[in-house]
Amino acid sequence: MTAGHGQAAHTGDVAIVRYTAQVWGSRKAQAPLPEMDAQNQIITVGGGLTLPALDRAVENQPAGTRMLVVAPPAAAYGETGNKRLGVSGTDTVVFVVDIMQVIPAHATVHGEQRQAADSLPQVRIDRSGAAAISVPDADAPRELAVERLVDGTGQVVKAGQTVVLQHSSAVWQNAQGEDRADLFMSSHADGRPLTVVAGGGNVLKAWDRALVGQRVGSRVLVVAPAKFAYGAHPPKGIPAGAVVVSVLDILAGA
């Protein structure tokens, strides 16, 4: 319908899209589906985490594109449909999709980076965009520490808002005194940014606290004592009581 001229969306990239949807061939076609009237959605391109029709349609399309997508049941809600939206297992769904923004898989924030306080880990960004974290040869802070290293200029992140992050995390105790900590978690290693709901309780408590109130475009250092990280029951490979050091790049919000 309209050709865009922005960044093209490739596998591993994140696309922020805005769409409306209607059911083909029924009275429902006179009005958009409930809760799908010009709603923003964040899609990890090629990730298989959204409707197949949208995933396929967005790939290789540039930001600024508006497209018409006709999705038969197999590419929309499948044989079971979606009762909440009023879509049956035999319904074809028509989408009008606007690609608002494309965030490359290895994007980072831009801006002058400040040095963290001497008592906190220091951060460098390598050529891949991943954070190189240098942990002091000292005991970790007992309380949550959040320090903004790069000032973003975008919207302020609100509780409940979906945001797109690059992240790198290390365990303080495992890396104490090391110039470059081993990362146990990294979106750059995963090959795609992470989408989270700020303050939604689905990530570390420290991240939830650190994200809300920051501006999009910020880089934030988070040092999380165990009570704000994994506590006494961490995942495999992380010691109980671990202090987690994370570097978060807030790339976008929807």
Where are these regions (language model features)?
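Cross-family detector of peptidyl-prolyl cis-trans isomerase
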Residues: 1-254
